[in-house]
UniProtKB/Swiss-Prot annotation:
Source species: Vaccinia virus (strain Western Reserve) (VACV)
Family: Belongs to the orthopoxvirus OPG022 family.
Swiss-Prot/TrEMBL keywords: Early protein, Host-virus interaction, Secreted, Signal, Viral immunoevasion
Main location: secreted
Role according to the record: Soluble IL18-binding protein that may modulate the host antiviral response.
Signal peptide range in chain numbering: 1-20
Gene: OPG022
One Pfam family per UniProt: Pox_vIL-18BP
One GO CC term on file: extracellular space
Subcellular localization(s) per the UniProt record: Secreted
Gene3D superfamilies the UniProt entry points to: Immunoglobulins
Protein name as it appears in the record: Interleukin-18-binding protein
Amino acid sequence: MRILFLIAFMYGCVHPYVNADEIKCPNLNIVTSSGEFRCTGCVKFMPNFSYMYWLAKDMRSDEDAKFIEHLGEGIKEDETVSTIDGRIVTLQKVLHVTDTNKFDNYRFTCVLTTIDGVSKKNIWLK
């Protein structure tokens, strides 16, 4: 009896995602304005298991990319904002660069991790 319950439960959890109509989600998009980068991406399935964040890589050094919170003054990222439109959840995260001289040789990468995989998009100040 427990096995039947488990099978029925798993079918109920997975069936809506397997048999759902294909929903189109655009790739990551970055919009720039004075001193900020706005990264937007959408999630088709299980948005609670998705995460959006920014990385920064100093192109003059051999160091790996770093999370924004490890870079100190002159840069910060807002909390991720999510909006729901039907069955699509759109995530958005804004990166604020106030010290453009300090970060003029950096590459910034917006990363969206979902159950479908990882999407990345790069942008530079100059």
